Amino acid sequence: MKITKNNIVGSCLITLDKFEDERGFFIESFNEQKFTKEIGFYEFVQDNHSKSKQGVLRGLHYQVKHPQGKLVRCTQGSIFDVIVDLRVNSSSYKEHFTIVLDKPEEILWVPPGMAHGFYTLSDTA
């Protein structure tokens, strides 16, 4: 697992180990022990999966009363992903970060207190 920080405090791109051969590939998509060691402990309360057609914009979404962190991954196709820091006491308050996600081994960690959304670039994603 490789961690690449960005301009949003606490956010990062996680590049998972991908094992590939003639049969296909294998990726361990989440390991609580590794995640906690690299990023910290967060209780995950929900797991969502969506499929969107090209040109669909989802977001920007955020939670006011019960902020949630998100692990965002595009397993098929490509998306233009955006996060905005809405944490008033954060040194990156009101800053944004964008990335094209198009590899199943890449996951964007979006800490609690962010607005998040994405735009579908490919036919489906």
Report residues per predicted region.
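Non-catalytic, conserved peripheral segments adjacent to functional cores
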Residues: M1-L101, S122-A125
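Conserved metal-binding segment of the jelly-roll/cupin
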Residues: V100-D123
